[in-house]
A protein has these predicted regions:
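Catalytic cores of the polymerase beta-like nucleotidyltransferase superfamily
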Residues: 1-459
Length: 459
């Protein structure tokens, strides 16, 4: 900001979220600056002065972005709309975002709509009756700001958001996903999702979630599918915050793991939240009741993987995130089925890790959250057994991730030893050797070759 003050030739103001966050004492690295003149000149001058990069963000609106080369901060420079800063602020979404501070901080806040008073009351209020008509995305932004800031929403604004929610269908999917991500990864994500429900936004942007409402489950569940899904998300968030409560010696390793970047500017922990939201997405369409009255959801894991991928495709998420969340849905039942096989053979552990690769750790954590959120009949003993197995598999998954098991010889060596050409048969035998090695059944090259010769198909 000091650099911008030095290069500004025309009146300019810091506006929007940066002013709000400064008033709240919150750190920010994202600034909007409204200039009464040429935004391009100010952006380029700032870039030269700060050793940053400037480029046009919207040529139609004359908006330029300046980004620090190390991506520590960014500034969007935009021309004032209307004849004055007050008129410009009148086109903004909420009063807490409709404040301006003269560049350099000399002079009073420009606050024509009572944003400071709303900050003190921790309240979100629209600037004008047309706020949601001008940009329907503001309905989602309302939920996002409410959960990020912990603010309430005044009744008139809630009513206007509810009236405008259907128009979210007209908003570009990329913009919807940008807001939805911030809601899902917020500390108060459940509050944000509840507000989305209250204004009708969920029905438009995540109808798969809405369809879970009222879908009753078996006696082993104490909640319908929708409330169970919210509870699984709550357990995932709790695991992020305090992994030691359930994961014991693996807590530190899990914390590091969840902090790793994955895709779409999400960490693995944040992507796991999307897995929690979508892992049971296919339950409404797979629900059946047997003649004995038992509720089943056969195939909801495979169908859910397809549905989860479809949701994220619609939102224009990256291929990596789509595949990741789909894999979580596909494999989230595996651990639960294995509880009945305890004590596990090494081959069973190998097959679990191999089948779930590369989401072994992620899906094990999702399974823990899923089990903790299932507290129907006989749940206490079931949870104890599930967590006991989960800790075993989590340790194995973390070790696998550090060093994937390998057979005692390479593929080319095996091909020469048993006289096979590269192809499907050789790949099958290598996989068998890897499993046998993991199980401790072979450890030397000679043992591997002997087993391979037994495994070669006679034809």
């Amino acid at each position: 900001m000091r650099a911008m003050v030095q290069v500004a030739r025309e009146p300019a103001w810091v506006v929007g979220g940066a002013v709000r966050d400064r008033a709240l004492g919150r750190p920010t690295d994202d600034y909007d600056v409204a200039v009464q003149g040429d935004a391009r000149h100010l952006a380029r001058a700032l870039a030269r002065s700060a050793g940053a990069h400037a480029f046009p963000l919207s040529e139609a609106f004359g908006v330029w972005r300046v980004v620090d080369r190390e991506r520590r901060w960014q500034v969007d420079v935009l021309p004032i709309i209307g004849g004055s800063i007050e008129q410009d602020l009148g086109g903004r979404d909420f009063t807490v975002n409709a404040m301006a501070e003269p560049l350099g901080g000399e002079g009073a806040y420009v606050d024509p709509f009572g944003g400071l008073a709303d900050l003190r009351e921790r309240r979100l209020r629209m600037v004008s009756a047309g706020a949601f008509v001008e940009d329907p995305l503001r309905t989602l932004r309302l939920a996002r700001l409410a959960c990020e800031l912990g603010f309430s929403v005044d009744e008139t604004t809630m009513a206007a958001a509810r009236a405008g929610a259907a128009a979210l269908a007209q908003v570009a999917p990329e913009r919807i996903f940008a807001e939805l991500k911030r809601i899902v990864i917020a500390d108060r994500a459940l509050d944000g999702l509840a507000l989305m429900d209250a204004v009708g936004a969920t029905d438009v942007v995540l109808p798969e979630l809405s369809r879970m409402r009222g879908v009753e489950q078996s006696l082993y569940h104490h909640l319908d599918v929708y409330e169970h899904t919210r509870s699984v998300l709550a357990e995932v968030i709790a695991l992020e915050r305090s992994p030691g409560e359930w994961l014991g010696e693996y807590a530190e390793a899990v914390s590091r793991f969840l902090a790793e970047p994955l895709a779409n500017e999400l960490t693995r922990g944040q992507a796991l939240r999307f897995g929690a939201l979508l892992h049971d997405a296919a339950k409404p369409q797979t629900r059946r009741v047997t003649p004995e009255g038992r509720v089943t959801f056969i195939g909801h894991d495979a169908a859910g993987a397809e549905l989860a991928a479809g949701v994220l495709t619609r939102l224009r998420a990256s291929e990596r995130l789509r595949e990741h969340v789909a894999a979580l849905a596909r494999h989230h039942l595996r651990l639960g089925f294995m509880v009945h096989e305890v004590p596990l053979e090494r081959r069973s552990i190998y097959r679990y890790l191999s089948a779930c690769e590369p989401v072994q750790v992620d899906v094990t954590l999702l399974s823990v959250a899923d089990r903790l959120a299932t507290r129907g009949r006989g749940s206490e003993e079931a949870i104890r057994r599930h967590l006991e197995l989960a800790r075993v598999l989590l340790g194995e998954a973390l070790a696998w991730r550090d060093e994937r098991p390998r057979p005692p010889l390479r593929g080319d060596e095996l091909a020469r030893a048993v006289g096979l050409r590269p192809g499907r048969e050789l790949g099958r035998i290598l996989a068998e050797l890897e499993e046998a090695s993991f199980a401790g059944e072979i450890s030397s090259r000679d043992q591997a070759i002997a087993l391979a010769r037994e495994l070669v198909s006679p034809d």
